[in-house]
Amino acid sequence: KTTPYALDFVTDRDGVFDDVLQETMLTAFKAGEHKVRAQVSSLVPKGLNKAKIEKIGNVDIEKGGATWLLPRVKDDACFLNVLKQMSTRLADLGYSVSTGQLVWNRFKSQLRTTKGKNSYPLVWAESITSAGFRFSADRKNHVPYIDITPQQGFLVTKSECVLVQRTTSKEQDRRILAAILPQGFIDETGGVVVENHINIVYSNGLFSAVRPDVIDMLLNSHVVDRAFRCISGSVAVSAYELNSIPLPSLEQVMEIQSLIDAGVHRRIIERTIAGFYGVMIA
């Protein structure tokens, strides 16, 4: 039995491994169980044989298979203390996460450039933008439609939900890029097919008080993006990680919903969400 003792994040992704961009963390374990807080540092490569080590802080590592919350910068130390007190997750708000059902290269014969009788819009990750949902299939190998047989109804999404890109990098301004798939677009087209590089955050029917636009606002907030960066260690934005993000309490989420209903400016709502995480923003 061992316990994490030290964790070093390698700041560079380029040049660590040949011909690949790979985020790397070096972890040292100590035999046995101990109560010493693990030391987290960043390791900045300085050529082939040298590196600068910058201490970030000491943290308690979650036990029992729970998600590790690790600071990426010094300012995250206090932030993590708040995160660890936040017990609400997407499931507590009545939402589940699944991966887009369509692996496109398994259905090549059904892809269409024009809409036919049995066609549905095929939603790619490029349709999720910082300005919201914008149906698009402009990138290489992307087409806008797919024919669906009567036996493939499971591929079709017919209810409003929040779509999240499954692949982003730490260099991007936002690791979580989400957009509402509007019910109006679904009703107009009869449904859509969501490609596999997208996560679908949908109401599971167990609790319906929180609307999708509120979940969208939360996931796109700067402070939730910061929390996600303390969880994620790769370019993948997995369903497991989305389900692990600490979120405000139900009462606080309903307060956010009330602010949206009142037409309050997004900047004020961002400030309110940040406050729930103990973060002050201008």
Question: Residue ranges of each PLM-predicted region?
Answer:
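Signature of N6-adenine DNA methyltransferases within the class I
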Residues: K1-S96
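Polybasic, glycine- and aromatic-enriched phosphate-binding surface used to engage nucleic acids
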Residues: D76-S258, A262, R266-I281
